[in-house]
């Protein structure tokens, strides 16, 4: 495990019209290496998870949590992953009652697993922290207010991972299955991005909507007003 770093993040800060320092750009370098499968490292009572949540490490992860020695799961620099893997990691976290923390970047599958913690917080330190929660379509302000609060996060993820696949006669060859629709809706780069950037005045929190066309350049995402991650339940105090 490498120590946390700012590798891959491009950050620029500038004063807005109100004179407050705000986040103006956040990007992941195009030259960043492909995401590796999840790796686990136990550091005392903290289990550090880095890499993509693809399900390959779920058994080891579950075993670690059921041992009773882990109090906090720390996600560090995790990108991509599947909705199924997100659900499996989230279920294990929820069942064990551990806390979760993000140190660096936690995108897509990692973000939903992060929300399953008894408490879920951004880690301290000089790094830029960020999570991106995939959505099937742009959420309204009313949906944002409840979408990831408490058990709603579990229900939202379930939209991407249907558990019932009852066999039905196929009416037309072009008709997609419900399972197919749900999986097609899971786009790791399409979602709501929450960031915390260190400044001389403390951390600045911002929220953005990313339509998936931004690629690795999150500075192209649209900033959302009145979307404080604490008020929305994405982060706990």
State where each predicted segment sits:
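N-terminal signal peptide c-region/cleavage motif recognized by signal peptidases
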Residues: 32-33
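STAS-typified acidic loop motif
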Residues: 37-60
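Terminal peptide-recognition signature
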Residues: 49, 73-74, 114, 229
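Extracytoplasmic/secreted envelope proteins and their assembly/folding machinery
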Residues: 58-62, 86-90, 94, 111, ...
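Short, glycine-/small-residue-enriched flexible loop/hinge segments at domain edges that mediate gating
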Residues: 70-85, 99-105
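Glycine-rich beta-to-alpha active-site loop
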Residues: 94-141
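Charged, glycine-interspersed solvent-exposed loop segments at helix/strand-loop junctions
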Residues: 139-237
